[in-house]
Structures are given as structure tokens and as C-alpha cells.
Amino acid sequence: MQIRFLFLLCLLLLGAACKKNDTPVTPQPTFGKEVQVTKTAEPAVPLPAAPLFSQPLATTIIEATNEALPIWRSFAKNRPALIIAANTPAMLAVPAELRTEVDALLNNADDKELTKRSSPNNPDPLLLPIMSLSAALDAGWFSQVLWIFPSKNLPEQLELATFQQQLIAAGIATPDEATSFTLSQGNFSGIIRGRPFTAAPAATLPPLEQSALLHIDADYFKPLYSGEIKTPIYPLMVDFLNKLKAQNWKIAAATVVLSNQQFDALPLQTRFLGKDLAAVLQNPQMLKDSFPRQWERRANALYLENFMQKEEIHKLYLEMEKIDPRDPDVKFGLYNISRQRNQPDHALVYLKSAVQIDPAYALEYLALAQLASEKNLPEKAVVMLQFARAALPENPFILTQTVHTLLTNNQQEEAKALKPKLATLKWSKIYYPEQVGAQEAILKLLEGK
């Protein structure tokens, strides 16, 4: 599908980010200065902000980037800068045929409707999470953008021509926008959607005079993490946060994406990462002090996985559970280690406990359903899918997968029982054309046609 193809291209990008301009019509990139670029003639309202990590920061944990839209919109009158640290900057352009509707959604819908119509679990969305920042720029919410992209390369290894080509291929920039970019001191700088846009690795972050919002996607660490031996996750996180702190940027609020329910999602084992990032933003003293003992135990458990120390890992997670019985990440850790210890019944009990506290962990049932199908155990696959549906009833993909599995298992009556629910799904012909045809075929099959 074209949208998914473009998104995969997005993941190849190295960066883009933040500039200044005094002219609303044709802004010129002026590195790091405060800008007044607005969609309307209304002046921006000054935004109260404090240097990052100088005090607790209002931080919202979200599942997918689209959930940041209502928060960003609440600051739109201030026209702040946006600093986004992510593997991909959610800058895929909104399809031309939907831009009028998307503009109306962003400007007129209430927060609930805005989130719903952009959700990754909506079969008929107006925009996808990977379009969130693109849509926000179209709406004029931000004056400039700084994208902090993950990179293991040295600044001198970055290539402008390659970056420009990738911007165009990924649908992030038009050819004219791409040619506006320059490369200096490890920063790509240009104009996208009429806004100064800069991309930089954490090693060469630019100054920024203007107050900003901060958006961190846990997937930022995906290309940087190579296991606990080479790149232990907590030191990696601390190094990144210290680089942000050194800039002394004025930040008004932050959003942190867990990124387990977006396209190209992070594995559920990483779900703790976004929560811990948010904890440090909310309590900056943690960056100076030793991290909580629970985090040390988790780090040790992750490290010991490299040496198959199942009993020691199990012991660590049991200690963590005793300290915080309501931590779903610990329950999920116990689920994983119980599977490794060949205790499937215990594992399912821990998984159920994790799901009861944090329903997103029900996505693991999909992996178990796939495993059961591969082992030619369709009945168990159906049971796992039913568990997933019970915890995540609004996820249309689970429903369609359940019906497909039932039909594959010749459970016609059980599949027909889901037909009314399946028939209510309206799939987007733009984003999910293959689902439109598949659903029509399944409904005809269930009707006996």
C-alpha cells in the first residue's frame, strides 16, 4: 500500500529542524532565532516556560502521536516551537483529497473527536498518527520545528543530497521544499509547510531562543539500542536527557509516546521506557540522583537475559513485584520469564494480570495467537484472539483477524456470530483499500453467497 510504503521510506530519513523568519509568506531559515510565522494575522501569545529540567515539567504519556494533537492545539495561540525526538517525525503529508476535512477536524472538533478520527485503531481515519505533525503545521500551530533524529553517524558523514531525496520520496517535502535545505554543523535546515524546519542528531543540537513544546517518542531509541551489553538502555536514556538539558531550552509542556500501538510499533518489552522518560521529566532531580532501585533491578534483569540467567531474572522480577504489585511492566516481565522457564500456565496468569492493569499488553495475545496457528492449534489461536478482543474491543484489526481465524478453523457459526459487529466496520478506501475488499469477501462468505 502506498501509505505504508511511504512510511517505510520515512524511517530512512536522517533529520530536519528549526529556523527563523520575519516574513509570513516566504520565511527564510535563520538558525535558532525566535520566529513569528502564523497561519492568520493574529499575533502569537507569549508562552510561559522554564529551562528544561529546572523544575517539574507537565508531561503527558500517550500511546500514539495523534494523541498529542489536542495538547498541541491547546498551545496553538502561543505559536511555540516544537522539539520532536523520534525515529520518524510524523511528517507524512495528509492526502490532498482529505486536507479540507482534516483542517476542519483540527480546528473545530472537540478533543475526543480529534483523537478518535486520527487513531491507529480507527478503520476510517481522516489522518494517521504518522501525519500528526504535518497536519499541525498545516493548521499553523507551530512557528518552527526541531527534529532530533537518532544517529550513530558522525556529523561529517551526513549528506545533504541524500537527505533531500529522502524528504521527497517519503512525501514529507515537495521538491521545492527539499531544495531549501542546507547542511551546516551537523544540522539540516530548510522550510517545510512554510515553517522553518531543522533536523539534528543529539550530538549537535542547535540553540533555540523561543519557548517550545517537547515531544519524545520512545521509538527514538530503536536505531540506537543494540542490547544491554553494547548499549544499556538506562545510560542511553540518561545521555540523551543530559544532552537536552545542556541546551537550556525553555519548555512549557511535554508529551511522551509509548509507541507500542503505532505502525512499526516497539515491542511490548520496551513499554517501561516511555514511562520512565516521563518520570524524569516530571521529577528532574532524578537526573542528578541515583535512579530508583526498581530501575536498577530491571536493568539487571535485561542484562542477565544475555547470559540465560533465568532463575536470577525470575528472582529480580519477583522482588520488583513485591515492592510494586500494581506495576504492569513487572507483570509482563514475569510473563516472559515464566515462558522461558517452561511455565506456560504461570505465564498466562501474569499476562492476564498485566492486561488488567494496562490493556495494551493484550497485544501480546496476538503474538500467542500467531504462534498457536503456526503450531496448527487453531482452537488456542481463537482463544488468544478472544482474550485480545475482550481487552481491546475497539481495535478493528483484532476483530477481523478473529473472524478470519474462525473461518480457517471451519468454525462457521462462531464466525457468523461476529458478522453484525464486522458489518459495522467502515474501512477507509484511502488508507486501507485492501481491508475494504477483504471485508466484502468475508461478509459474502458469511452470508453464504
PLM regions: where:
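C-terminal motif of bacterial Sec signal peptides marking the signal peptidase cleavage site
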Residues: 14-17
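TPR/TPR-like (Sel1-like) alpha-helical repeat modules
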Residues: 387-392, 403-430
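Active-site histidine-anchored catalytic micro-motif
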Residues: 56-156, 160
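TPR/TPR-like alpha-solenoid repeats
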Residues: 337, 371, 405, 422-425, ...
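Catalytic cores of soluble, metal-dependent hydrolases
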Residues: 31-62, 68-78, 129-131, 142, ...
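Bacterial signal peptide processing site
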Residues: 19-21
